[in-house]
């Protein structure tokens, strides 16, 4: 997993986080961590 910095849509726009992760070659992403402020990308 890869964590992106803030500003990738979290916590209010999880879709933006997902799109960011796809744009860097990952399979997708979601908002995680404290108050869902961190965009976490996944491969599988």
Swiss-Prot record:
InterPro entries per record: Defensin_invertebrate/fungal (IPR001542), Scorpion_toxin-like_sf (IPR036574)
| Localization per Swiss-Prot or TrEMBL | Secreted
Query: Keywords of this protein's UniProt record, alphabetized?
Result: Antibiotic, Antimicrobial, Defensin, Disulfide bond, Immunity, Innate immunity, Secreted
Q: Which cysteines are joined by disulfide bonds?
A: 10-31, 17-39, 21-41
One biological process GO term for this chain?
defense response to Gram-negative bacterium
The principal localisation class reads secreted
**What's one GO-annotated cellular component?**
extracellular region
Top-level taxon: Eukaryota
Q: What does this protein do?
A: Antibacterial peptide mostly active against Gram-positive bacteria.
Its family remark reads: Belongs to the invertebrate defensin family. Type 2 subfamily.
| Protein name as it appears in the record | Defensin
**Organism of provenance:** Ornithodoros coriaceus (Soft tick)
């Amino acid at each position: 997993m890869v964590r992106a910095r803030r500003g990738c849509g979290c916590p209010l726009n999880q879709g933006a986080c997902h799109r960011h992760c796809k744009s860097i070659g990952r399979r997708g992403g979601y908002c995680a961590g404290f108050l869902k402020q961190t965009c976490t990308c996944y491969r599988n």
